[in-house]
Amino acid sequence: MASLNKLSSNDIGNIDRQIAKLKQGQILTESEIKSLCIKAKEILSDEPNIIQVRAPLTICGDIHGQFHDLIELFQIGGNLPDTNYLFLGDYVDRGSQSVETFSLMLSLKVRYKDRIVLLRGNHENREINKVYGFYDECFRKYGNEIVWKQFTEVFGYLPLSAIVEQQIFCAHGGLSPAMESVDQIKQLNRVQDIPHEGLMCDLLWSDPEETKNGWGISPRGAGWTWGCDITEKFLHSNKLKQIARAHQLVMEGIQKVHNQKTITIFSAPNYCYRCGNQACIVEVDEQLRMNQTQFEPAPRENEPHTTRRVPDYFL
């Protein structure tokens, strides 16, 4: 019997047309999005909370609705299915094309489900994206909240973490005082809005602290900060070598702290069209060597392009 997730030739043709349509700058219809979300939920519901990922692959950080820069990212990193991708979350909000961005991400997931992993970020949550742009954008482009509701249902099915070759732990935010073993992530019910505290919250909200050891109160109001000693203990007890995460704007697109064992990757250049930062993607080869590629914003019209420094902590 054929797998429920196996695409028919007709499905493949439809998805390929949708991908081409999106790349041409058109949005999908409501009915196309409804069908896409149904297929995506079927695929994602088969994935565990922690995805075991093989190298080679390319790890990418926040995208935040910067659709032109996502297209540029694929130009630089290589198109699917020739390149395997792991995205660390935050596909929506802030940027002006979150609808196109997440439509493309889901279309690629449905088309090449074994070639792309989409983790959940803290913005893949109703409470956040109703305020920071995604809800308003959906309403503006479709005239109702139906599409927003369909997309936000999918968010609950996105996995929470990944481990590359049993050595690199990946999550959107980071560590939690509630987690000694990564196996605890397996027990979570992820199909829900992100709680305000606890392990699931912390995985998507926490940040590394460069200068202090131990756990600290996060200035974000959710999650924690964690020091180098916490990283060392976590890696040792779970037989891991590194942590890769996103969640924080870093001006060069990548930042390594905690003796280079905690890596922050940010893939939205000139964040919010004003921050002046570079973006970065990180290729991991079969020997787990990392090759970072930094890039500037894709050329586009009618968007401000100014440079200014912003605080380290940006929701």
UniProtKB/Swiss-Prot annotation:
Record PTM text: Reversibly methyl esterified on Leu-315 by leucine carboxyl methyltransferase 1 (PPM1) and protein phosphatase methylesterase 1 (PPE1). Carboxyl methylation influences the affinity of the catalytic subunit for the different regulatory subunits, thereby modulating the PP2A holoenzyme's substrate specificity, enzyme activity and cellular localization.
Active site: 123 (proton donor)
Residue stretches of biased makeup (Basic and acidic residues): 298-315
InterPro entries referenced in this protein's UniProt entry, alphabetically: Calcineurin-like_PHP_ApaH, Metallo-depent_PP-like, PPA2-like, Ser/Thr-sp_prot-phosphatase
Gene responsible for this protein: Ppn3
Protein family per UniProt: Belongs to the PPP phosphatase family. PP-2A subfamily.
UniProt KW Hydrolase keyword: yes
GO cellular component: cytosol; nucleus
E.C. designation(s): 3.1.3.16
GO biological process terms held by the UniProt record: mitotic cell cycle
GO molecular function: metal ion binding; protein serine/threonine phosphatase activity
Transmembrane residue ranges: none
Organism: Paramecium tetraurelia
Region listing for Disordered, in residue ranges: 294-315
Reported cofactor(s): Mn(2+)
Binding site for Mn(2+) 1: 62, 64, 90
Name the UniProt record assigns to this protein: Serine/threonine-protein phosphatase PP2A catalytic subunit 3
